[in-house]
Amino acid sequence: MIAGLNVITDNLDYLLWGRAATGEPGGVLLSLMMAAGAAVIALPGGIVLACLAWRFTGLVRKALFLWAELIRGIPLIFVIFWMWYLLPLMTGGDLPGALTVTLALAWFTAATVMHSVLAGLNALPSGQYEAALSQGFSSQQTLLRVLLPQALRNILPSLVGIFISLLKDTSLAFIVNVPELTTVAGQVNNRVQIYPAAIFIFTGVVYYLLCCSLEQLAKRWRITRPAL
């Protein structure tokens, strides 16, 4: 048991930061960086797509739903593979692995955010839209100033669940050897070749603590925010 803990403590810096001191972040730090980067892209992207789907009917909405269902129906690991091979062809050069995975996570998550935000908008009383229009608001002002803030607050638990899944999905970066937490845990296990249970139990505990922390932060934010 003590020896298993020694494996963790001896490699703790590498598991937490990777080689950040030499400009190559890894481990927990890189997992958080990829999750944060993907969230920064996916959240506003998903909101914009949801607003377009809510505002416009017909071909625009059908095209957005088709795109979202296509993305959600494909395993994320395939999206990562596609990005890994297609982005260099599109950009004419190799991209950093962490950036490629971040873009894949953002693309995948934006579709889920779109559906969640759209559900929140559709759940609001329809009379609010007519009431805002009668007060002189335009359709765009009504959506952005009246409906969207309420919808986002109402779907906060859903968004938290989405971003918890996003954080856990960063572990799939191991498939293209991006040195996030799961990858470096595997590297440590391959190097020491003993106590794999201790290494991967530690990895699981770290993911659990990160996800619980995110959930608690969201709860605290929801409690302290004034009601709309």
Would you name each region that the model predicts?
Residues M1-L228:
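Transmembrane alpha-helices and adjacent helix-loop boundaries
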